[in-house]
Amino acid sequence: FLPLLLAGLPKLLCLFFKKC
């Protein structure tokens, strides 16, 4: 579960700040 959360966080930040 934790690895999934850590993998999903960068994607969420990418969407919010639009810096992919």
Swiss-Prot record:
The keyword Disulfide bond applies. Expressed by the skin glands. The keyword Signal does not apply. It comes from the Eukaryota. GO terms for cellular component: extracellular region. Antimicrobial peptide. Has low activity against the Gram-positive bacterium S.aureus and the Gram-negative bacterium E.coli (MIC<15 uM). Has a strong hemolytic activity. This is Brevinin-1DYc. The lineage of its organism: Eukaryota, Metazoa, Chordata, Craniata, Vertebrata.
